[in-house]
Structures are given as C-alpha cells and as structure tokens.
Amino acid sequence: VFDSGGNIIEYLKNINTNQGIDDMVLISYDFQAGSYIKKAEKNSEYEGKRTDIYAEIFNNLGDFDSIMEVGVGEGTTFSNIVPKLNNRNVASFGFDISYSRIQYGQKHLKGKKMDSSLLFTGNFFNCPIQNDSVDIVYSIHSLEPNGGKEKEILTELYRITRKYLVLIEPIYELSSEQSKVHMDKHGYVKNIYKIALELGYKVTDYRILFEDNLQSDNNTGVVIIEKNSKILSKRENISPLGCPVTKLPLSLHKEHYYCKDSLLLYPVINKIPCLLPENAIVATHFFD
C-alpha cells in the first residue's frame, strides 16, 4: 500500500481491523519514516516561508523558555522553527508515536547542529510530560487524523501546557467544501474551537492561516489557547519529562529513565527515550 502511494490509515480502516486509531497512525507513520525529510529538502523555500509564519506566531506570544512539538515526526518543521525564535536559549522538545521517525529526526537535528533539542517517543493521549511543565506546546497537522478524540487530546495537551497551547491544524468549520469532503473521508478532527470553549479554555486566536490556500484539501488554521501567560518564573534545569502512566517526574539513571514514584523504568535506545505507556518496565529494585 505504501509503495503504491496509498493511504495506509484508510486501508487499515477499510479492512475492518480491530486496531485503534493510534495504532493505525503508528503503523502508517513508521512506514513513512524518512520520506518527510526528503520532501522538505526538495521544498526548502516553501518550508522556510511556512515556518517564518509559525515562528512569528510563537514570538508574538511574549517571553517563554521552553517549547515542544507534539507529533514532531522527523523534525523537519521543528528544525526550521526553533532557530527563528527570539529566545536563542529556549529549551526545545518534541515527541512522536513512531520510533523510526524520531530516529530519522534525531539524525536530521544533528545535521542542523541542534543537539540540545530532545526528541523522544510518546503519544498525545498519554503524554510523557509532567503537569504545567512546558511554556508553549504546539502541534502542526499531527492531530488531524484523530477525529472523535478531540476532547481527550485537548484535555491532555492542556494538562502539560504552562502558558500557551497552539494548534496549527486544518479547521473543518472554516474550510472550503472541497476540504470538508477530504476531512470527512479521512476522519479528521472537528470542532476544536467549540470543544475548547466547552472545556472552559480561553481561546485567543481562531482563524485560517493561509487565505490563498482555501481551495486545498488541508486548510491550515490556528487555534491558540492561553492557559497562564502571566507566569514569570522559570523552570530552570528542570526536565519536563514525566511517567506517561502517573505523570510524575522521570529521572535519568543508569542511562535510562526511571520514575521512583511508580517504580516504572523506560528504556533509552540509541539515545532515544522510549516513553510510550507500553514501554514501561516494572523495576522495583532498579536502584539496588
């Protein structure tokens, strides 16, 4: 299916598999690993202009010391955004459900001399991040195939956000009819703005980003949710990583991550922290 240019998620849905959408996304994206870097390199001018706009959105949010992309993939967009941020010393993080994509992303960032950025595996239904620990949490077209899970995703991403949650995703309600047909077919997320308001969140921006792109299948929009922008104190030298099961702090010990509260160990493979809930190993005597 992948070699013929087909949509793997659509294929898995059509064969009536019992797998959930997160498993389908994992399989699909793992097959695609490496392809996004090639695409970005072929379209470097487009990527540059697009990320200029994204970086401007973040820079206009005021002071922040940490930023994280959920569904970071191979880091192609991430690697173009972080160097354009006003804070050159910002702590930057990214996670993705696919180990293979993170592996490619790690190599990609190394080539960009972004060794200080940390990439790891994780999913946004059980983020391996502590509460209120990252100033700006953002997504770029990573939530889109998770239609029906909007409330669950928003609640979890809001939990880990310290100042702003920025969702750069196709917005069904503001899109063209052509786009809506495409989004309905592929089960895209809907009603993000409405659900955010129902959850009591403060939405400060809600619009289509590229008006000249209204006839495309994916009308990229932005939803900005302000959580607590007035926080001035920094979380200096404090890792935001947390156990995806308990949300409590993880510490690096014997080259792996361990949660002393839950007694769960998470392996680091090829310098990639594997922080999916299913990666957890019960290790009650890890410090012995």
Language model regions located:
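A conserved beta-strand element that flanks and buttresses the S-adenosyl-L-methionine
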Residues: Y138
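Class I SAM-dependent methyltransferase SAM/SAH-binding core
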Residues: E74-F125
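Conserved beta-strand signature within the Rossmann-like core of class I S-adenosyl-L-methionine
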Residues: R162-Y172
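N-terminal auxiliary segments of SAM/dcSAM-dependent transferases
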Residues: V1-D22, S239-F287
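Conserved SAM-binding loop and adjacent beta-strand
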Residues: K38-I53
